[in-house]
């Protein structure tokens, strides 16, 4: 089983993205593929879940561990498969979904593709009260993007090793995030220029 993949995002299609990792392209189904567009041709970290069936081996990808945890909880419900779970995650505000489950809001739950009244009731029965305050509430892809930018992470670690404080680096991190696709060295040079201003 895989926990996550670090690789270059090389392709986006309506239902999948492709991550190139050491010359192998991994086809990964994700909730909102085009939300990954800003990270095209950059190194990303994507959390994955592998589903092995008789006729296929499939990878499902997530922005963060919370989104993956939500997916795993959803597929544990009878009547919800991996594709339905991804559709629910794509269509939902995760916090609203969790509140609907905890408050037995069947009407809200039946608005999702493939979720009828019976499945919604099963979701409430199986999942109500099983989410902690942080356990499965997702964050947006843009919030998670810096975690997926390995070159930027390496640059920040290198600057900290050189003695720069985390508070100093936090001030310029947003500006650096806007410069997608740079190497670690280029991020370091850019950071030093920003701190000299």
UniProtKB/Swiss-Prot annotation:
GO terms for cellular component: cytoplasm; Holliday junction helicase complex; Holliday junction resolvase complex. Transmembrane segments: none annotated. Gene3D superfamilies: 5' to 3' exonuclease, C-terminal subdomain, DNA helicase RuvA subunit, C-terminal domain, Nucleic acid-binding proteins. Its main location: cytoplasm. InterPro entries: DNA_helicase_Holl-junc_RuvA_I (IPR013849), Hlx-hairpin-Hlx_DNA-bd_motif (IPR003583), NA-bd_OB-fold (IPR012340), RuvA (IPR000085), RuvA_2-like (IPR010994), RuvA_C (IPR011114), RuvA_C_sf (IPR036267). The keyword DNA-binding applies. The RuvA-RuvB-RuvC complex processes Holliday junction (HJ) DNA during genetic recombination and DNA repair, while the RuvA-RuvB complex plays an important role in the rescue of blocked DNA replication forks via replication fork reversal (RFR). RuvA specifically binds to HJ cruciform DNA, conferring on it an open structure. The RuvB hexamer acts as an ATP-dependent pump, pulling dsDNA into and through the RuvAB complex. HJ branch migration allows RuvC to scan DNA until it finds its consensus sequence, where it cleaves and resolves the cruciform DNA. Has three domains with a flexible linker between the domains II and III and assumes an 'L' shape. Domain III is highly mobile and contacts RuvB. This is Holliday junction branch migration complex subunit RuvA. The lineage of its organism: Bacteria, Bacillati, Bacillota, Bacilli, Lactobacillales.
């Amino acid at each position: 089983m895989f926990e996550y993949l670090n690789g270059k995002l090389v392709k986006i299609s309506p239902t999948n993205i492709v991550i190139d990792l050491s010359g192998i392209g991994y086809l990964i189904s994700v909730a909102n593929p085009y939300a990954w567009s800003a990270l095209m041709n950059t190194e990303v970290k994507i959390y994955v879940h592998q589903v092995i069936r008789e006729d296929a081996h499939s990878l499902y990808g997530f922005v963060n561990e919370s989104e993956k945890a939500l997916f795993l909880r959803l597929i544990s419900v009878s009547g919800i498969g991996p594709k339905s779970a991804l559709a629910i995650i794509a269509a939902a505000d995760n916090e609203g979904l969790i509140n609907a489950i905890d408050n037995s809001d069947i009407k809200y739950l039946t608005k999702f593709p493939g979720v009828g009244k019976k499945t919604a009731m099963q979701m409430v029965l199986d999942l109500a009260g099983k989410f902690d305050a942080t356990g499965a509430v997702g964050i947006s892809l843009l919030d998670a993007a810096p975690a997926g930018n390995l070159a930027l992470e390496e640059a920040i670690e290198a600057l900290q090793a050189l003695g720069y404080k985390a508070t100093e680096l936090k001030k310029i991190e947003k500006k650096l995030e806007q410069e997608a696709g740079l190497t670690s060295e280029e991020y370091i040079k850019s950071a030093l220029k920003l701190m000299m201003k």
